[in-house]
Amino acid sequence: MSTLNLPEPIAAYFAAEHHPAALAHCFTPHAVMTDFGHHYAGIDAIKAFLAEASAKYSAISEPIAIEREGGCQLVRTRVTGNFPGSPTMLSYRFRLERGLIATLEITA
């Protein structure tokens, strides 16, 4: 894991990337996650998607940069795993609300 100074819910998200139940505690109850155009609304949908993605891709994310982008935190991440094009750089846009992730958008 990198030594970036990530806000707590973002750091917790990356620390628990292979533990969907723990990841669910990083999100607000009505959080929305978008992964390459696919939308997941609510904790149960997010948890199910993350469990499936973890099992399928065995991805490991290494945050390498963070910056403010409007009302979001943009984290640039190097991701390796069992998928075509690995390793690759992805952008994770987090919008935080009351110390939890309210929205997360993952794009190339």
Regions found by a protein language model. Name each.
Residues 1-108:
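C-terminal and inter-domain tail/linker signature
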